[in-house]
Amino acid sequence: MAVEIAADIRRGNIIEHTDGQLYVVLKAESFRPGKGTPTTTIEMRRISDGIKVVNTFKTSEKLEKAFVEEVEHTYLYPEGDNFVFMNSANYEQVTVSGAMVGDGAPYLQENMPVSLQMFNGDPVSITLPPRFTAEIVETEPVVKGQTASGSYKPAILENGVRIMVPAHVGVGTRVIINTEDGTYLERAKD
């Protein structure tokens, strides 16, 4: 285990908390008030049971960061509430719980390359590619003259995810989505 100060903890890090459990960091934000002690608020998910917790630490407080191995895998198929991935190097299959995949589940596509973080040979976290391409299947019709405005409208993708898209984007358009926060990035160029 490596020791890191709270201010250096980032999304995706695996830390061992004071209760002896491993947690994956979902979000870490530092706050530096004009007066008082700077703090870091860390939102994390306990690996053993998937429970989310939010803790606030002094930015100089030391936390134990677990050594995890990044292993490239390929997504194969869903299996009930779980997902099956194949190790790209040795072709071994690994089953990952739906709780671990979390909000990224709708973005999984067959043969999609992902990175699994492994701790003692077990998957503890997953990293999806930063971009996902999908087709819009439902949205309001395109209104002439709104191509340059900053207004957005709701749309539903082929995987069922609801997003906000610019007013000029219509049904059948392929768009690129940010997998971290589910926001529209741009039209696909294919």
UniProtKB/Swiss-Prot annotation:
Any GO BP: peptide biosynthetic process
User: Per its UniProt record, what Pfam families does this chain match?
Assistant: EFP, EFP_N, Elong-fact-P_C
Q: In which pathway does it act?
A: Protein biosynthesis; polypeptide chain elongation
Give this protein's Gene Ontology molecular function annotations: translation elongation factor activity
> Its function?
Involved in peptide bond synthesis. Stimulates efficient translation and peptide-bond synthesis on native or reconstituted 70S ribosomes in vitro. Probably functions indirectly by altering the affinity of the ribosome for aminoacyl-tRNA, thus increasing their reactivity as acceptors for peptidyl transferase.
Q: Which family does it belong to?
A: Belongs to the elongation factor P family.
- What is the protein name stated in its UniProt record? Elongation factor P
Q: Tell me what gene encodes this.
A: efp
